[in-house]
């Protein structure tokens, strides 16, 4: 039992400086009897009501005009369910007292959250509609162990931090409160007095929906239902599957022509999805769709890691978009950013007045390239927040893969830092051991919980084993972007063909390390911004040669071992750099048939042909699937190789990277017979010169390049051709 409340406690409670509201508010046994206390600012009268009968049991005395009420319930000794009849501004309202409910988080959940091993922390933390003791409302939970006081504020309480202070679970540092009547769609934030005594308003790290910039409140929103992984979607991610990825920034793929406004998720489902399917792509990759305050970050500086951005609609609208993609046979990859977060005061930065999510030392916790903060992966609750987020997108939205951004910046402590600007690890090395363990753990958990979904790493160094299993010392990613291949091949293609013979190795070097990782060949958004020019504009020569070079390059890329990725606009050879504030240049495809149509048709045919022939994708990561036929003809800039499937069927790929047609070009082959040209980037269908081999060509029993049989081909200028052997 306790005595009646002290005046200093009332003052602290009303001032918002009292950390343990449940010790004061609600129903308590005292020496005077069963006492009910309530903090109800602006109320004039308060009664305790029996819910079943509506009978008034006692009127509470106003002990402080600022809204503190208390009263003893006559003839009652044991706790019972009650309601409060409150008169505000002359009108009576019947409410349930949030301080009559017991602890919300179960002991096992609290233990797992503290340990950092809760697989799905989002099922406990955040805002969740619930029914407790027959009362509907919302339970709120937030991790802020160093805050002095935390309250829920929102549309349900006039954004008044005095009205709903939360209970601190000291064993976990989590604050919790069930608010009767709070419901889906209402805005809320957490108001806290932080570790330094400063008043802060924070959005919910686990909010499932959030306001669009410039507003920053969270929305009460229930968890979406789980999405079942189908066998078809699992197969589409496998190493032997054809994977051709269309990378998209939803805000600039296409816009309304009358006002330059974004398409909604549902409009994108109706326009983007069928377009990507028609183009023959197998996967859509979305630049980050997590809520973010700055359009110019392209989503790579998220503040709402669990909330799809409202720029294009609601959470359910985004689910509709994903469902439409799946119905069209497209898997969906989400760019995921666990490497850093922005410094905006309303979000994770100094969340409870301490460096809770980030490192305190800027040599570990600040990324000077992007003016962002770096997660403290060594803190269990932080890693749990991120691992749970990865699982959330896959399980609750049906995301099929996560492309992890800026992995190199995570795994190296000296990334983009000079001497003295970074702190070595415990062994004196430059590796961020905590980040490495976080990535391994994330990939392990995803492999166990949602097998079939995969991860891809954008890793720009030669860190070993990025896409190798953890038991082999790897990070456990399924795929890694081959940025070295991308840089080498683009450096080669931008050269005048006269000088390419001196840089032949830029095209041949990639195969030397090709089987060290499971590579994706990316022509991503990063290659068409910041003055790098468009892919088309990097090609040398006049307009005809630029387009011919681009077509030859695409033919080479789609044939080379590795999965494919192409950023939007490149499929029809957009001439300018990407602008996130405007639509792609779809007008280039208006009017009569032109070179842009030709490139678009080529990319579609590349996708369809690549998908149809197993030799082009089945053994991307097995040396048996590739063999050079001509690798050393640098004087004529000719390269020829075969792709092979598990059954030994071959496709010959020949590229001529000069504008000079090569007639009667003889080279040795493995399999004699009749070979049919199935793709020619110089075809008139693509607005080329239409040089080629008339459809089919027969091999000769003439030795060449160390082989008994050979083919004699016409290699079109600035072109790549594919040939398949026909059955006799």
UniProtKB/Swiss-Prot annotation:
Keyword set includes Glycosyltransferase: yes
EC number: 2.4.1.18
Pfam families: Alpha-amylase (PF00128), Alpha-amylase_C (PF02806), CBM_48 (PF02922), GlgB_N (PF22019)
Alphabetized UniProt keyword annotations: Carbohydrate metabolism, Glycogen biosynthesis, Glycogen metabolism, Glycosyltransferase, Transferase
Active site, renumbered: 405, 458
Record SMART domains: Aamy (SM00642)
UniProt KW Transferase keyword: yes
Top-tier EC class: transferase
GO cellular component annotations of the record: cytoplasm; cytosol
SUPFAM superfamilies in the cross-refs: (Trans)glycosidases, E set domains, Glycosyl hydrolase domain
Molecular function in Gene Ontology: 1,4-alpha-glucan branching enzyme activity; cation binding; hydrolase activity, hydrolyzing O-glycosyl compounds
Pathway per the UniProt entry: Glycan biosynthesis; glycogen biosynthesis
Chemical reaction(s) catalysed: Transfers a segment of a (1->4)-alpha-D-glucan chain to a primary hydroxy group in a similar glucan chain
An example Gene Ontology biological process: DNA damage response
Protein's job: Catalyzes the formation of the alpha-1,6-glucosidic linkages in glycogen by scission of a 1,4-alpha-linked oligosaccharide from growing alpha-1,4-glucan chains and the subsequent attachment of the oligosaccharide to the alpha-1,6 position.
NCBIfam families per the UniProt record, alphabetical: branching_enzym, PRK05402.1, PRK12313.1
PANTHER family in the cross-refs: 1,4-ALPHA-GLUCAN-BRANCHING ENZYME
Family, as annotated: Belongs to the glycosyl hydrolase 13 family. GlgB subfamily.
Subunit field text: Monomer.
Protein name per its UniProtKB record: 1,4-alpha-glucan branching enzyme GlgB
Gene: glgB
